[in-house]
Amino acid sequence: LDIRTKLALALVFVSLLSMGLISIFAYQTSAQLLQDVSVRQLDALAEGKAMDLAKVHQGWRDKTRLIRNGAELHNGIEALISTHDDAAHQTLTKILTHTALGVAGVERVTVVDTAGREICQVGSAAVFGAIELPEGERDIVYQGVHLSEQKGLLVTFTSPLVVNGELIGGIEVVFDADDLEKVASNFTGLGETGEVVVVTPSKNNKVLVLNSLRHVDALPSPGEIPEEQISEP
C-alpha cells in the first residue's frame, strides 16, 4: 500500500474509533439518565402511595369519631350504666348495630366502662385481648393491626367516651383493611413486574405484610415473611 492509502485507512480507523467511543459514552449517559428518571418516578409513586395510605388512616379515625360522637350511643350507654338491665342492654345493642355496623368497613364495635370492662359489643370479628383506653388528652388512638383467620387483616382504634365533660367509658372500633388493599393493589406506573408492599414490624426478624402481593405465590394474602425477603428481587 502506498502512503496515501495508509493515511486514508488510518483516518477511517480513527473516525470509526471516535464514533465507537461517542456511542459508548452516549449509551452510558442515556442509561444513567433513564435510571435517574426511573428512580424519580418510583420516588413519586412511593410518595403518592404514602399520601393515599395516610388518607385511609385518617378515614378510619374519622369513622371512629363519627361513631363515638353519636347522641343515640351516648344516651344508650348512660341508660345501661344507670340501670344495668337487659332492656337497656338490648337497646344499646340495637343502636350499635344500626349505626356503628352501618359504617363502611366496620367489623366490630365494643363499648367498655371506665374500668375497661365490656358492657356491650356488636360484630363478628375476633377479640384480640383487653381493650386499652387512651390516657390523658389523647383522643383517638391507633392500637395496631391483627390477622384473623376468618376476617383477614383487621385494624383497631380506641377512644374515650365523654358525655357532658365526664368520662363514662371507652369504645373500640375494628375495621377491615379493604381500603388499604385498594390502594396497594393499584399498580399504575409499575408495569407488569412492579410490586407494592405495605409492611409493619413484627417479631423474630419478620415483618407483617399488610396487603396481598401479586408476585409472591406463598403470600396471596396478608401475612408474615422474613425481613430479608422484602429486599429480594
Predicted regions and their residues:
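Juxtamembrane extracytoplasmic/periplasmic/luminal helical "stalk" adjacent to the first N-terminal
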Residues: 3-87, 98-107, 153-157
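Short, conserved clusters of charged catalytic residues that mark active-site
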Residues: 8, 48, 91-95, 175, ...
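Extracytoplasmic/periplasmic ligand-binding sensor regions of membrane-associated signaling proteins
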Residues: 55, 93, 97-174
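Short N-terminal helix-loop-first-beta-strand/juxtamembrane motif that initiates sensory/input modules
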Residues: 59-69, 98-118, 185-209
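A structure-centric signal for secondary-structure junctions around beta-strands
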Residues: 61, 106, 151-153, 167-168, ...
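Conserved helix-loop functional segments at active or binding sites
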Residues: 73, 109, 141, 179, ...
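Polar/charged, Q/E/K-enriched amphipathic alpha-helical segments with strong coiled-coil propensity
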Residues: 80-85, 91-92, 181, 223
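Intrinsic low-complexity, intrinsically disordered coil/linker regions enriched in small/polar
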Residues: 120-122, 164, 175-233
